[in-house]
Amino acid sequence: MSSSGNNASVYGGDEINAIVLDSSSFHTRIGYAGDDFPKIITPSSYASPNEDAMELDNKKKNGKSKSSKIFGESINIPRSNHNVSPILKDSVIIDWEAAIEQYHYYFDDVLTLNYKEQPILITEPVWCTPQYRQTLLETFYENFDFPALFLAKSPTCISFQQGRPNCLVVDIGHDSVSVTPVIDGISLLKNSMKTNYGGQYLNDQIEDMLTHKFSGVNFENRYRIKSKTPTVYPEESKYTVRDLSENITQSFDDYQRQNIWHEFKETMLEVPEKKFNTSNTSQANSLKEIYSQDSNKRLFELPTGQSLELCLERFQLADSLFDPQSYKFNNPDLATKYPPSNGELSLTNSYDDYKPLKRARKAESNQSTPPPSDAKKPSSKTSQIRGLTHLITHTLSTIDIDLRSSVAHNIIVTGGVSLIPQLTERLYSELSNSNPGLKIRLHAVGNSSERFNQAWIGGSVLASLGTFHQMWVSKQEYEEAGAERILNQRFR
């Protein structure tokens, strides 16, 4: 096996500019280590022709085959017989062929990389299986000419971006909400938790609520609208439809309609000070009365030009991040997408989790931290559901008691959904009440672009450190040792 010391002479110089790749469910980010922001932010989806379009395309090309996948914002252009498909789900690649083509497109055609001179740092979520990590490693070593690479856990990157080696990373993303303790810059996998009550969960609630409350309204996609006249519901919408000769697929239409729910989420939702679903009836009624006042009314304009007035619903939907069981789906198909989740991960990693020195000394003295009060087996279906505050509180209770106060003082809130107004204020209030013995402190970057790209920025910081050159794992080392051995010895 080649030593890491040999890698230093090759990759340790200042002239080396590593590539940082951060792929998540909603967007993929690519750029250079040391930069403040990624060069490329692209959807983690692609468009491709279906069988009818492929047959017609092959006739035009006289049977010559060429990749027909479309990446970037171009997937939003209507095309006949083209489907839109995701590349990742839960920040994990589900379409390897499309992922490889997407990376090649941006590495070769957009950035025109010189592979021989640039190693790559790849971020990964903490819930990746050993089989997935091995496939990821083999894919990059076998399909690209990078001389070396490094796999970095996303929470670790975020901790570096904030300069907080001991912290709790709360990532409220598109497909999931995850809570991960980071100690000495290393993510503690066994203490991590994840639920699916994230951005897509809100999107589905928004779709369910709007289509049920405004059943007669036409939620037409923007690309179909030729002209429109502004109206306010219940006045009928006034618009003309564009004459489209293209045979638009259902997947493209569904993808475009998600943009409506996404825009609603970003512009209309606001977190209430307290949860609505409470046993205190007078408090619940008082809250509903407050958030039903005219000052809380907002108009949301649809692509058709028709505006919908909403008030209390804006707060009730956002409240479901903290209390997922508070929203009852009208559409059973949407409801089945979100079974009750307590956030506990069944990780089957083949390597031991990181153990801080304090934890080792404590074990030697036969002392133990009392189990968390909510760590017992749930007694009912509802007790299995953990909202945002409950998820964080439970994670804190599983951390070594000597480290708990340090972690509670450094809670990093990140992810695009965390930008919903008043979310951090509500979270601080509930965490302080739930953990009276801890001094809670939240750290949420004010710049929305920075918070949205925080994992990538952390990877950029990490890969540009002067001491990081010894961490790169060369392709030669991979060829000599194999993916499984490298994962166990170098990427623990």
Swiss-Prot record:
**Stretches the record annotates as Disordered:** 48-67, 331-350, 359-384
* InterPro entries, A to Z: Actin, Actin_CS, ATPase_NBD
- Give the GO biological process terms: chromatin remodeling; DNA repair; kinetochore assembly; regulation of transcription by RNA polymerase II
Instruction: Kindly give the PROSITE patterns that the UniProt entry links to this protein.
Output: ACTINS_2
Q: Which domain of life is it from?
A: Eukaryota
Do you know which CDD domains this protein is assigned to? ASKHA_NBD_Arp4_ACTL6-like
Please classify the protein's predominant subcellular localization into one broad category: nucleus
Which chain regions cross the lipid bilayer? none
Location in the cell reads:
Nucleus
Q: Could you cite one Gene Ontology molecular function of this protein?
A: chromatin binding
What keywords sit in the KW lines? Activator, Chromatin regulator, DNA damage, DNA repair, Nucleus, Transcription, Transcription regulation
Its assembly, as annotated, is: Component of the NuA4 histone acetyltransferase complex, of the INO80 chromatin remodeling complex, and of the SWR1 chromatin remodeling complex.
- Function of the molecule: Chromatin interaction component of the NuA4 histone acetyltransferase complex which is involved in transcriptional activation of selected genes principally by acetylation of nucleosomal histone H4 and H2A. The NuA4 complex is also involved in DNA repair. Is required for NuA4 complex integrity. Component of the SWR1 complex which mediates the ATP-dependent exchange of histone H2A for the H2A variant HZT1 leading to transcriptional regulation of selected genes by chromatin remodeling. Component of the INO80 complex which remodels chromatin by shifting nucleosomes and is involved in DNA repair.
Q: What is this protein called?
A: Actin-related protein 4
